[in-house]
């Protein structure tokens, strides 16, 4: 079964998001783009809520969100029960997001991280497995 990915960004991450959609589709993933669809200014919560809702409902396996700092989309997504959105800025953090927190949304700071680094972080994340054990107990305390 193919991994399905929900992706979205505000205007600050629009250009990078387009590249990420192509990157993921070329790797064989099924991707749904929740917008935005231009560089016109939008409010990041409008996009982040859609992606997080789709993850919460288990319509997609992984979410990817971008905004200027990554903080806004991460905070918004984490308001949804069952969503574990991780702000990632390097490959090690992305790996740990999967291994230790079983994150289901990756959030990127579009103004501070290159699209090449985002691609590496997504690949690293998808190549990891959740370690369970003590981490599962900790996640239970969040839920």
Regions found by a protein language model. Give the residues of each.
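Short active-site oxyanion
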Residues: 4-5, 60-63, 82-84
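A general structural signal for well-ordered alpha-helical segments in protein cores
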Residues: 17, 44, 48, 70-74, ...
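A short beta-strand-loop structural module common to alpha/beta enzyme folds
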Residues: 30-41
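SAM-dependent methyltransferases
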Residues: 1-4, 25-27, 51, 59-60
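Glycine-rich phosphate/diphosphate-binding loop of Rossmann-like nucleotide-binding domains
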Residues: 6-26
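Mid-chain, well-packed structural core segment of small domains
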Residues: 65-107, 111
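C-terminal binding/interaction regions
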Residues: 6-8, 12, 91-143
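Short, structured active-site "lid" loops
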Residues: 47-65, 69
């Amino acid at each position: 079964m193919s991994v399905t990915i929900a992706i979205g960004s505000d205007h600050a991450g629009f250009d990078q998001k387009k590249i990420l959609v192509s990157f993921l589709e070329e790797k064989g993933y099924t991707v749904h783009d929740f917008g935005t669809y231009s560089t016109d200014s939008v409010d990041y919560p409008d996009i982040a809520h859609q992606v997080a809702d789709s993850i919460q409902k288990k319509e997609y396996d992984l979410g990817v969100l971008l905004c200027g700092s990554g903080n806004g989309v991460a905070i918004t997504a984490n308001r949804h029960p069952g969503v574990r959105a991780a702000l990632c800025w390097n490959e090690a953090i992305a790996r740990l997001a999967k291994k230790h927190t079983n994150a289901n949304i990756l959030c990127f700071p579009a103004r501070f991280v290159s699209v090449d680094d985002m691609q590496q972080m997504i690949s690293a994340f998808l190549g990891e497995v959740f370690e369970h054990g003590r981490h599962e107990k900790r996640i239970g305390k969040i839920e």
